[in-house]
Amino acid sequence: MELKTQIHAADNRQEILITREFDLPVELLFKAYTDPEIVEQWMDNKVLEMDNKQHGSYQFEKKDAQGNILFSAHGAIHEFLPNQRIIRTFQMENTPFPAQLEFLEFEKITEDTSKITIQMIYKSVDYRDQMLKLPFKQGINMAHQRLQEIVSRLK
């Protein structure tokens, strides 16, 4: 599968830069990141909380068929500008990774296309490098592909 989501991780830096263009208006791309029902579909996680506003918060989790929690994450929203920007923290629970800071920038390219740029900043280069050893690149690319397919039906 072609990796349409571009991931750049410069040596000796604490950040990952993610970019992806979508065949979606910027309003729909933004909605895909902020509407709990849509988020659940493309992220394949249950949204427990999503308070989309400055000083808001969010929480996701994924369970197996027996009800065991496989993944849980939460964060605080620091800035929320509709169709433009979200600045938030992101922390996975029950992992060695501390909270990271995420800057999500939404850009209109044309009436029907848009781009997201995500800058993720980690506590250290080592934590960033540990994240990159996981199937991170393939996972985010697959999630973005699902986002494109699911949200395209809303046009």
Question: Language-model features: where?
Answer:
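Hydrophobic ligand-binding cavity/cleft-lining segments
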Residues: 1-46
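Hydrophobic/aromatic beta-strand elements that line small-molecule binding cavities or substrate pockets
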Residues: 20, 47-48, 72-79, 90, ...
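Short, solvent-exposed aromatic-acidic interface loops
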Residues: 91-98, 119-126
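Helix-adjacent hinge/juxtasegments
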Residues: 59-92
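A short, structured loop/turn motif at beta-sheet edges
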Residues: 26, 52-53, 78-84, 105-115
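A conserved amphipathic terminal alpha-helix motif
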Residues: 123-155
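Short beta-edge strand/loop motif at the mouth of beta-sheet-based domains
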Residues: 17-18, 36-72
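Hydrophobic pocket/interface hotspot
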Residues: 29-30, 39, 58, 77, ...
